[in-house]
């Protein structure tokens, strides 16, 4: 039996009691909404399609996102990335401050439109995927009985695949900016990167087309400098992969600053531990700072030489572009697409089209 009572000046309290079922109650601003809710619950009870929504009415989206981030995310391979996406979602109080029962496709669409003013459609789509995953898990595992609104939300159009390549001059300035600064007696550093791992990491990325996560997870026990291979037991797509190392890649690994030396001063081969003992956050920040230094150096050199700077020099360059650049260079050496996929780790050969972008001037030379 349903009951509606007025609470204060602006609230209506609705209750539904039925033997054999838990009591249901909810507060509304308008009496009409309370009456509609009572009819819905009573209809569900009559048809035995009753859904207990008390947990959904009690929890906000923020509470569910935080619980998921703490309990589920840490067990995933992409834990760090997913956790960052959840942090971004939690910043939108207009969405995550709502109760789970109040999250409709309209509310998600409003959030989508706000977010599209800040980031690309691809980024928004990935954040929408996280929302959908959290809704499904909460409903199936935690008894949060609400419909997932995501299937009703129109997805933003995907941005065109990136085809940003580094020019030879851009690469030269970037690598120079990644060269380590020297610590002074007063604790300050001369101009350059403070993190000694950034330069060799970027150089190896440009030589092997390995992903950022693969490079950071690379262990010395999986590196064979004599056979010139680097084994990756766990990659993004879940498959193990052994990456062939060029002579340049081997030289980069041999020159790493952490390689211990014998009493005679000669470096010995490492057999265990992380090849690049740094973090994804340190790499992201260090790479961004190096881009800024490289641009400043370039502009200063152009001014000194009295020449006009190239527009867009090192603009819109991200670390993942090193994989694109490396794959494009490898495509020039490996004409067999299967060989190329074995190096880069692409299971879908069509994906390699994103990375094979020969320069027009290079193709012109081949044409004669």
Question: Predicted regions: what is each one?
Answer:
Residues 10, 121-127, 140, 144-212, ...:
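Basic, Lys/Arg- and aromatic-enriched nucleic-acid-binding interface segment
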Residues 1-29:
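Short, Arg/Lys-rich segments that mark the N-terminal edge of DNA/RNA- and chromatin-recognition modules
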């Amino acid at each position: 039996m349903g009951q509606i009572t007025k609470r204060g000046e602006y609230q209506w309290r609705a209750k539904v009691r039925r033997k054999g079922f838990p009591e249901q109650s909810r507060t509304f601003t308008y009496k009409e909404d309370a009456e509609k809710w009572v009819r819905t619950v009573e209809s569900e009870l009559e048809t035995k399609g009753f859904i207990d929504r008390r947990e959904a009415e009690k929890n906000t989206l923020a509470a569910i996102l935080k619980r998921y981030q703490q309990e589920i995310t840490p067990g995933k391979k992409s834990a760090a990335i997913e956790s960052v996406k959840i942090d971004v979602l939690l910043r939108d109080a207009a969405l995550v401050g709502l109760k789970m029962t109040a999250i409709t496709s309209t509310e998600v669409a409003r959030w989508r439109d706000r977010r599209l003013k800040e980031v690309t459609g691809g980024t928004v789509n990935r954040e929408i995927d996280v929302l959908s995953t959290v809704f499904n898990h909460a409903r199936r595992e935690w008894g949060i009985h609400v419909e997932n609104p995501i299937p009703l939300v129109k997805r933003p159009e995907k941005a065109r695949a990136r085809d940003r390549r580094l020019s030879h001059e851009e690469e030269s300035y970037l690598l120079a900016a990644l060269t380590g600064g020297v610590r002074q007696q007063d604790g300050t550093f001369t101009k350059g990167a403070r993190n000694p791992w950034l330069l060799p990491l970027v150089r190896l990325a440009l030589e092997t087309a390995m992903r950022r996560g693969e490079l950071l997870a690379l262990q010395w026990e999986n590196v064979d400098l004599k056979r010139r291979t680097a084994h990756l037991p766990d990659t993004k797509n879940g498959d193990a992969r052994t990456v062939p190392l060029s002579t340049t890649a081997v030289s980069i690994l041999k020159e790493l600053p952490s390689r211990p030396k014998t009493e005679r001063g000669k470096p010995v081969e490492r057999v265990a531990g992380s090849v690049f003992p740094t973090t994804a956050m340190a790499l992201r920040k260090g790479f961004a700072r190096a881009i800024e230094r490289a641009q400043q150096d370039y502009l200063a050199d152009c001014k000194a030489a009295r020449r006009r700077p190239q527009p867009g020099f090192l603009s819109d360059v991200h670390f993942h572009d090193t994989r694109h650049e490396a794959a494009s260079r490898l495509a020039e050496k490996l004409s067999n697409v299967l060989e190329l996929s074995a190096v880069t780790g692409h299971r879908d050969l069509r994906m390699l089209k994103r990375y094979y972008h020969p320069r027009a001037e290079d193709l012109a030379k081949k044409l004669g």
